[in-house]
Amino acid sequence: MVLIRVLANLLVLQLSYAQKSSELVVGGHPCNIYEHHFLAFMYNSSGFMCSGTLINQQWVLSAAHCDMENMHIYLGLHSFKLPNKDQKKRVAKEKFFCLSSKSYTKWDKDIMLIKLNKPVTYSTHIASLSLPSNPPRVGSVCRIMGWGSITSPKKILPFVPHCANINIVPYTVCRVIYRPLPEQSRTLCAGVSGRRIGSCLGDSGGPLICNGQIQGIVSWGSDPCVNRGAPSIYTKVFDYTDWIHSIIAGNTAATCPS
């Protein structure tokens, strides 16, 4: 019941956030209850919400711009109306960013690693997602998911996460649409050409999954969401795997790739 009351507050407060605050799955469909066991729902009492990805029993990967005070993290959650018996609530014990100042740009270092206050036990609805062994190829079919708005510019938040398939597209496509993106960045460009399918308000920090691995983190996109079929920008997880492994191993002074 507490979570349902929280959602009611989120529905009122979250809709007032600007597009830059957080990203949604537009043009998708309700996820199967068994396909998102690694998906984390993150929120606070102020109405800010994001997603994250469980990468082992005590660590969640998300976007740096999803950092918030008094962060609550739900794992094993599917429906706000019908909670799973094995869903768990955690808080952040520690947060790690690529820069000590927590600064990032739209095209670089939008990544946050969260250590939970205590590990979760894997169950029917809770399990981790693998980090990438190789970067994704252009043309790869990937999966996005989250509790973000399912329409734009009008914001409608669902009671269950929505999923959609999108493609990795050439980075040059995003450079043309989103000027002045640099010639190179540690991001991925992904969407569906000519169709309004993609991430939006409330999905920020969630995973871009290719071949069963987390290849991207929802970072930002157009306003309205997926405007005229525009692709969105995702943090390229493969470029940060060494940093992630180092932090988890206890080397908290590890530096991110330049």
UniProtKB/Swiss-Prot annotation:
Residue numbers annotated as active site? H65 (charge relay system), D110 (charge relay system), S204 (charge relay system)
- Disulfide-bond pairs as recorded: C31-C163, C50-C66, C98-C256, C142-C210, C174-C189, C200-C225
Peptidase S1 domain location is 25-249
**GO molecular function: any one?**
toxin activity
CC per GO annotation = extracellular region; secretory granule
The organism's place on the tree of life at top rank: Eukaryota
Q: Which GO terms describe its biological process?
A: proteolysis
Q: Which residues are glycosylated?
A: N44
Q: Which InterPro entries match?
A: Peptidase_S1_PA, Peptidase_S1_PA_chymotrypsin, Peptidase_S1A, Trypsin_dom, TRYPSIN_HIS, TRYPSIN_SER
Tell me the keywords, alphabetical order: Disulfide bond, Fibrinogenolytic toxin, Glycoprotein, Hemostasis impairing toxin, Hydrolase, Protease, Secreted, Serine protease, Signal, Toxin, Zymogen
Q: Residue span of the signal peptide, if any?
A: 1-18
Where would you say this protein principally sits, based on its record?
Answer: secreted
Where does the UniProt annotation locate this protein? Secreted
The protein's assembly and partners: Monomer.
Q: PANTHER family from the entry?
A: KALLIKREIN-1, KALLIKREIN-RELATED
- Please report the name of this protein according to its UniProt entry: Alpha-fibrinogenase-like
